[in-house]
Swiss-Prot record:
<keyword id="KW-0694">RNA-binding</keyword>
<protein>
    <recommendedName>
        <fullName>SsrA-binding protein</fullName>
    </recommendedName>
</protein>
<dbReference type="InterPro" id="IPR020081">
    <property type="entry name" value="SsrA-bd_prot_CS"/>
</dbReference>
<dbReference type="GO" id="GO:0005829">
    <property type="term" value="C:cytosol"/>
</dbReference>
<keyword id="KW-0963">Cytoplasm</keyword>
<dbReference type="GO" id="GO:0003723">
    <property type="term" value="F:RNA binding"/>
</dbReference>
<dbReference type="Pfam" id="PF01668">
    <property type="entry name" value="SmpB"/>
</dbReference>
<comment type="similarity">
    <text>Belongs to the SmpB family.</text>
</comment>
<dbReference type="InterPro" id="IPR023620">
    <property type="entry name" value="SmpB"/>
</dbReference>
<dbReference type="GO" id="GO:0070929">
    <property type="term" value="P:trans-translation"/>
</dbReference>
<comment type="function">
    <text>Required for rescue of stalled ribosomes mediated by trans-translation. Binds to transfer-messenger RNA (tmRNA), required for stable association of tmRNA with ribosomes. tmRNA and SmpB together mimic tRNA shape, replacing the anticodon stem-loop with SmpB. tmRNA is encoded by the ssrA gene; the 2 termini fold to resemble tRNA(Ala) and it encodes a 'tag peptide', a short internal open reading frame. During trans-translation Ala-aminoacylated tmRNA acts like a tRNA, entering the A-site of stalled ribosomes, displacing the stalled mRNA.</text>
</comment>
<dbReference type="InterPro" id="IPR000037">
    <property type="entry name" value="SsrA-bd_prot"/>
</dbReference>
């Protein structure tokens, strides 16, 4: 019987989309696989990915990740033409796709990429069904975050 491999230290997260949580209310999250080329996997292993401007489009019964940027490595991609911003297919089952279509057809909803991470040896993307925030919503979130920090600071000094 073979031994299990020891877990490598470090985070499995490749990239986060912090702006999505700031600009949208995330109502539901899904985990999707990505159809990648070989050079893209090597770039992800090196951590060269940016999903800050990415979103998901639903077309012809399939979901596509649009706007994600995977910077090609110079040594890994000498024999192929690399398009860092190509549209990548998301791997979801039919039930999840139907749920996404149903949510998108409602007014004001969109699907955004939230994070890119490794799950075992597979690259996964967490996508979220989101509704845009207004400016006053962003301000109230900022006030709430500052209040949480102030509470923590007060509790820390109260124990002294």
């Amino acid at each position: 019987m073979t031994k299990k491999k020891a877990h490598k230290p470090g985070s499995a997260t490749i990239a986060l989309n912090k702006r999505a949580r700031h600009e949208y209310f995330i109502e539901e999250e899904f985990e999707a696989g990505l159809a990648l080329q070989g050079w893209e996997v090597k770039s992800l292993r090196a951590g060269k990915a940016n999903i800050g401007d990415s979103y998901v489009i639903l077309k012809d019964g399939e979901a596509w990740l649009f706007g994600a940027n995977f910077t090609p490595m110079a040594v890994a991609s000498t024999h192929v033409v690399c398009d860092p911003t190509r549209t990548r297919k998301l791997l979801l089952n039919q039930r999840e796709l139907d749920s996404l279509y149903g949510r998108i057809n409602r007014e004001g909803y969109t699907v955004v990429a939230l994070s890119l991470y490794w799950k075992n040896a597979w690259c996964k993307v967490k996508i979220g069904v989101a509704k845009g925030k207004k400016q006053h919503d962003k301000r109230s979130d900022l006030k709430e975050r500052e209040w949480q920090l102030d509470k923590a600071r007060i509790m820390k000094h109260a124990g002294r």
